[in-house]
Amino acid sequence: MNTFLLDYRQIRTPKKGFSGIFRDYVSDGHERSQLLTECFHLDAEKEGDYYKQLSLLGSRTYSRATLVDLLKRQNQRYGCSELHLKEIEKLRSPRCMVVVTGQQPGLFLGPLYTMYKALSAIVFAERQKALFPEYDFVPVFWMEIEDHDYEESAHTALFSGGKVAHFRPEPYKRLPDQMIGGSSFGEEMRNTVAEFIDTLQDSPHKEAISGLLNAAYAPGSTFETGFAQTMMHLFRDQPLILLSSQDREFKKLSRNIFARELATCPTASYNVIAQSSKLEKLGYTTQSKPRAVNLFYINTDNQRQKIELHEEDTFQIHPDKQRYSRHQILELCEDHPERFSPNVVLRPIVQDTILPVFACIAGPGEISYLAQYRKNYEHFGITMPFIIPRGSFTLIEPKFSRIMDKLLRITGKPGFSRKQIYHAVFNDLQTLKKNAEGIAEHPDIERLFNETKTEMERLLESLEPVLAKIDPTLAPVLAASSVQTLKIIESLEQKTRKAGRKKNEELLEQIQKSETAFFPEGVPQERMINSFYFINKYGPSLIGTLKNLLSGHSTEEHIIVEL
């Protein structure tokens, strides 16, 4: 198994690429230093910051007993093992920290990066335990089941016949803006599971995958249970803990944060705007747009509704139109914190206040919007944890490795390496495709054949005076032979050109297939393709293989893996 590391700054995806914030965050130099100074609290490259964070978390008070109880209850419901219960128990100690990551539940686990996030949290926690053996570090996967973007969660994709096959079950008894975690599946889900399984190629692992998904995504189950049971099964041998924030006990722990937001809004939004202005002055584009109130109201139908600040002390729920004074909504929050849900601005604050978070494993987009939140962390009286880029892979199947071999033979210069071919593919695929149009056909074909015909005519003409002296009747025979010889050369030229065009077409077709494999529909493979495509073909041991690769490499570079 070959691996190659690519600098994120050298990757240009056909569609959505990586933000400038993320590219600078994972690079070296002045831009990174400036970004960290202005937008983050800790630097993972500074040894002193690790001791600072350990001391800081050790001095804070957390509701550890409550956390342990609710995590045990949740994870037992998801089918955890004794390994996971022992891991949860560690959190009772003030010398136990959390390495957190998370994602909204995706259909059948969702795209590959969900698996990569979980593995990155596990590996980083193990690495910290090796560095600080007197502490424990527990990897926690925060399931963002309060998200209400059904279209994003209820979709997944597989490679099929050189194309991308999409799967989207129809919503079952779902209301607009309803939280996805509690959305249940109807009988239609049986068909979606069957179509998904049928699309997977036959393999020794297909039957087990079918059994897992049919059980986890049975009619009547929910996105939360389906996702959690699937995750727990795949990571049954890994110390990964799952967390659902849609839990009454967890909401009680969140109550003070919700109350501070309601009591001080729109201060948090002004903080994000001020931090965003700093980023824009540094030349970056920001993506997180705060609201005056960074909370949603959850009604009795589990719909997430906007809370609008109409006047200084008047709040209104949309679209239901209930109105509350600031005092009334604070009382409501005190009595019923389960009716509130943080948006993207407030969610990290909730996470890093309730959990003793040593580090957060984040994707490129998350790192970009976390850069906007430093002032908000300070507003809520906490320090940002280490922000660690998640592991990022492109998995290369053998047939595409062979295409890379062919490209290396045809386009490579002396000393050209496989890594340089991948660099060319990931850095400027369109230019590579344009260049390939002329690769197979020799650029000097026309000149060489013209020179050959001219030389042949000259040689044949030089025979004429010699033949005339020997026998004048040979002159017409020579003329006919000259015509025939030129026709043979022209025929050879046409066949050469035809062979070149065919070779071009084959090469371009192979490059096109590689583009679909590496950038399906123009986006990175890890953002589109479901994990089970590769688990089905290469077995569940692939998870351990990728974990080992992450253990040996920095997550600040993209990893190409030839399977």
Swiss-Prot record:
Coiled coil stretches, renumbered: 444-464, 493-517
UniProt cross-references to HAMAP family, sorted A to Z: BshC
Keyword presence, Ligase: yes
Protein known as: Putative cysteine ligase BshC
First-level EC class: ligase
Family, as annotated: Belongs to the BshC family.
Entry-linked InterPro entries: Bacillithiol_biosynth_BshC, CC_BshC, Rossmann-like_BshC
UniProt keyword list: Coiled coil, Ligase
EC number: 6.-.-.-
Single Gene Ontology MF annotation: ligase activity
